[in-house]
Amino acid sequence: MGFLSGIFHSRDKPTNSTNGSAYRFLFGGSNSGKSVNERSAMQMTAVYACVRILSESIAVLPVHVYKYTDSGSKEKAIKHPLYRLIHDEPNPEMTSFVFRETLMTHLLLYGNAYAQIIRNGKGEVIALYPLMANRMSVDRDDKGHLYYQYQMQDSDAPTMKNGTVILKPSDVLHIPGPGFDGLVGYSP
């Protein structure tokens, strides 16, 4: 019990600094055994307020389609077919504000925002419909081509069927948040 015992004395049981409530909220653990997901997080006033402020702030910003003139300057392209979709009404069910607010909410909660691009027989874009980010996966096929896999549910219009739908990149508007692989955003 001499000199070395003072250096190598036993210590109390180490404490885990990750047991705090802030850590559990941010990283998912909880003493109650309930997991925190996007929907349950939105039931917290602080999360709801932050998401609402950010999504509404983005949705209220003016959005226009521009074209270059012969002189090299830009002007609003009000007659462009995409102008109405982006500025006024992306689909018959929602305004541009609601569409952009929805996509921003998905981006904040899931790290990605997706919309299906609907085209007519000529290939012209006629509508944009938001898709639930938690039911979308992005992958590559055997040849390295990107594809999107969306899990349909009974409530999805217009098919009202369950199942998986494969979408080409040209049929999906994908807005990723910051991520690690360049394909999908990291879910916060």
Regions found by a protein language model. Give the residues of each.
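Structured, contiguous alpha/beta core segments that scaffold functional sites
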Residues: M1-P188
